[in-house]
């Protein structure tokens, strides 16, 4: 709404953007439009949340460390039940909620490890494997290993469905351009 306007970090704007250039330039309006398109799609109004979940956000990665957080992918049901002190109108999921999560803000919670796994999936055509950081532990008496990770049989965490190779290429190229073109890397 007008009280909570959404705009690009570049106050003059970037002009017409594609998904690839939107990623490369970190142009929020590209993602606002994407979020709104999902919100107003009567068949899949929570399709963006489905995409996030399909890529492993909102659930643990299975790393061999204690107390891993699952994060949160908010949706209409979550908002309705979470904000119990708010009015019924304020508890309704709206386009602003969707545009916020489209840029990773608002009520969405993801861990750095979940994002690393999502990037792993982008690099591997949708395949994600359970990450490991624990290699071995020496027994208390120092005589041998109490545990040793053998690295055999990588355990697949999930495989996100890729709609098309060209869609995946757009995202990969946008990520490449973040680093290797004059974009937000100069900011």
Give a label for each model feature.
Residues 1-187:
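Beta-lactam-recognizing serine transpeptidase/beta-lactamase-like catalytic domain environment
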């Amino acid at each position: 709404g007008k009280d909570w306007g959404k705009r690009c970090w570049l106050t003059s704007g970037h002009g017409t953007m594609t998904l690839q250039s939107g990623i490369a330039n970190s142009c929020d309006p590209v993602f606002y439009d994407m979020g709104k398109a999902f919100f107003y799609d009567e068949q899949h109004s929570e399709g963006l949340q489905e995409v996030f979940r399909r890529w492993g956000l909102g659930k643990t990665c299975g790393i061999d460390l204690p107390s891993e957080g699952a994060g949160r992918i908010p949706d209409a049901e979550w908002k309705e039940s979470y904000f119990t002190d708010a009015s019924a109108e304020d508890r309704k999921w709206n386009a602003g909620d969707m545009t916020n999560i489209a840029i990773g803000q608002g009520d969405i919670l993801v861990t750095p490890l979940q994002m690393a796994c999502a990037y792993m999936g982008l690099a591997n055509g949708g395949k994600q494997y359970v990450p490991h950081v624990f290699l071995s532990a020496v027994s208390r008496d120092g005589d041998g290993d109490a545990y040793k990770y053998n690295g055999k049989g990588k355990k697949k965490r999930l495989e996100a469905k890729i709609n098309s190779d060209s869609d995946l290429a757009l995202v990969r190229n946008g990520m490449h351009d973040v680093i290797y073109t004059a974009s937000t890397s100069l900011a």
